[in-house]
Amino acid sequence: MRKKKKKIVLSSTSEAEKVSIPYLPDDLLLNCLARISRLYYPTLSLVSKRFRSLLASTELYETRRLLGTSESCLYFFMTERRNDHEVYGKVEWCHVVHTLPLFNLSRALSCYHCLSHCFLMIIYIILFSI
């Protein structure tokens, strides 16, 4: 007597498809988010209030530190003397040649006058991994 072969039919909504990423537990979702570059965090924060909250949490940055996925960046601030314009930003995609040891914040503040004296640049340099 021949044995009938069992046919496996996959439904269009299998059990694996029913679990959606936004409904994962927080600790698992934090682990996933910690592996993604910070470059994508502004876009991911638009997914939901929960994502925005997790992306702003200290737990995410602690998870990134533990996983070794933290990224170095440089924050800066400049003002123009004549028009009181302010420029600030963040440099991320650079190779860190040398990191500075932690130091007193008052020493991090420095003033520089360019040769034409039209800019007063106050530069706050904060190097850290986030």
Swiss-Prot record:
InterPro entries, A to Z: F-box-like_dom_sf, F-box/kelch-repeat_ARATH, F-box_dom
User: Mind telling me what this protein is named?
Assistant: Putative F-box protein At1g77880
What species is this protein from? Arabidopsis thaliana (Mouse-ear cress)
Could you tell me which residue ranges the F-box domain spans? 18-64
Q: Which Pfam families match?
A: F-box
Q: Which domain of life is it from?
A: Eukaryota
Which residue spans traverse the membrane? none
Kindly give the SMART domains that the UniProt entry links to this protein: FBOX
